[in-house]
Amino acid sequence: MTSYLSNDTEAKLKKTKELPPHIHFIGIGGIGMSALAMILAQKGYSISGSDQKKNLTLKKLEENKVHIFPTQVESNIDEILKVHGKNILVVKSSAIHRDNLELCKAKKYNLKIKHRSEILAFLIEEKKSIIVSGSHGKTTTSTYITTLFSYANKSPTAIIGGIVPLYKSNYSFGKSEFLIAEADESDGSLVKFNPNIGLITNLELEHVDHYLDLEDLIETMKQFAQKCECLITNFDCDNLRANIHGSKWFSIQKIINIDFALIPKESNGCEIIAEYYEKEKFIDVIKIPVPGIHNLSNAAAAIAACRVAGILFKDIKKGIEKLKLPSRRFEFKGLWRNRLIVEDYAHHPSEIDAAISIASTIIETKHKLSKILPRRIVTIFQPHRYSRTKKFQKEFAKTLSQSDLVFITPIYSAGEDKIEGINNKSIGHELKKIKPNLEIYTPDNNQNLIKLIKEKTLENDLILIMGAGDINLISENLFLELLNNKLISNDIAA
């Protein structure tokens, strides 16, 4: 298959205006902001940023000569102006509140201020772009596309919403003309992009803090679809099939009238064997080395994007066996007291259902992970945002009811105000209605949660830790304690 990109695509890659020589990111430690900052630093811009939460990302930024402010105060802007003058650009994300001190000072000085989506749009205009959107699977699909491009020796620039195993990073500054990135629909900013190849993985109501209802979200996705030179969409998604008509369809359920089909034949909770078809013609049997039927759909989407971009299937196949999930996507963290610890970013009922489905398949097929044969599913869920919890409280309860033991932590607010009557205990109450005999715990803090994990879990449990907030700190604390105990034991033995 030759590239779908038209011959006059180069005209679209018009010479874009340069950004100011110095760019300051408010909240630079975020997964999306840090990737943009690193790409711009690699392009030769002077970069600074501020973030009040310490993490490894900030350390990496500093190693790449990015100046980091550990606080967000007005004096940061003054310090930047002393060095660089007023010809600077301030970048913010939707997470930055309008009362942010740095943002207020930048407005007071009448400095140029742009949303992070405008910076991504700038980078998209410079390259042949593959932009991935959808309610679920964006990070996994864009990680797959980036991996397949890399193993096909295409060296893409990539801006990803998670850590790509191949790069051990959320970005790649490539040498080719291609850019692969996610289009975040959470705030509607994806309508600013003009992709050469657009991809929508699926579509269902999400981000209820921004969208009134499903129709509101569909309208935004239609606007994105209209701006894509070529649009690849998921035939298996009812909402997409009914509302958005793409240039190309992919499917894991159907072959007839489908451009790219990946039909599952075997699964063991660790990998999936599937038959690959193009325009109803059988091409090959391939092994997808990641678990979960939803990840097979993500793989089908990634293969479709690569083929539309003109990559030969034989070159794509080289990378398929190297596919790995990004960080916090059913990520096996290790063994803790002979219990399997797995982390997943799931924070929507459909995502939780998909993660629990993988865990169930592992148990049903008696698939061993790290020499342990898991017997029970223990879920630890941190709800993300009060608005989402209020909207999907019953759905959360229904999907969590598939577990053998459930812990629900306090809600990670993500900056939202509390909603009266909406908390971890209200989800627990709904869960009890569905499964009265299920063992459910709703601790008030992480200290109590860790205590309960030690008391209530058993050897050979598969402990699935889910959420988009800081719930990953739980596994870090468990393993840190294990390491400290080992060090103490070694000291005593010595």
Curated annotation (Swiss-Prot):
Q: Which UniProt keywords apply?
A: ATP-binding, Cell cycle, Cell division, Cell shape, Cell wall biogenesis/degradation, Cytoplasm, Ligase, Nucleotide-binding, Peptidoglycan synthesis
InterPro entries in alphabetical order: Mur-like_cat_sf, Mur_ligase_C, Mur_ligase_C_dom_sf, Mur_ligase_cen, Mur_ligase_N, MurCDEF_pg_biosynth, UDP-N-AcMur_Ala_ligase_MurC
Signal peptide (residue range): none
Name-wise, this protein is UDP-N-acetylmuramate--L-alanine ligase
Pfam families per UniProt:
Mur_ligase, Mur_ligase_C, Mur_ligase_M
Q: Which domain of life is it from?
A: Bacteria
The UniProt catalytic activity note for this protein reads: UDP-N-acetyl-alpha-D-muramate + L-alanine + ATP = UDP-N-acetyl-alpha-D-muramoyl-L-alanine + ADP + phosphate + H(+)
**In UniProt terms, what function does this protein have?**
Cell wall formation.
HAMAP family, from UniProt?
A: MurC (MF_00046)
**Pathway, per Swiss-Prot/TrEMBL?**
Cell wall biogenesis; peptidoglycan biosynthesis
Where on this chain does ATP bind? 134-140
Q: Cite the GO molecular-function annotations of the record.
A: ATP binding; UDP-N-acetylmuramate-L-alanine ligase activity
Q: What is this enzyme's EC? A: 6.3.2.8
Query: Organism, per UniProt?
Result: Prochlorococcus marinus (strain NATL1A)
UniProt family annotation: Belongs to the MurCDEF family.
Provide a GO biological process annotation: regulation of cell shape
List locations, semicolon-separated: Cytoplasm
Q: Name a single GO cellular component.
A: cytoplasm
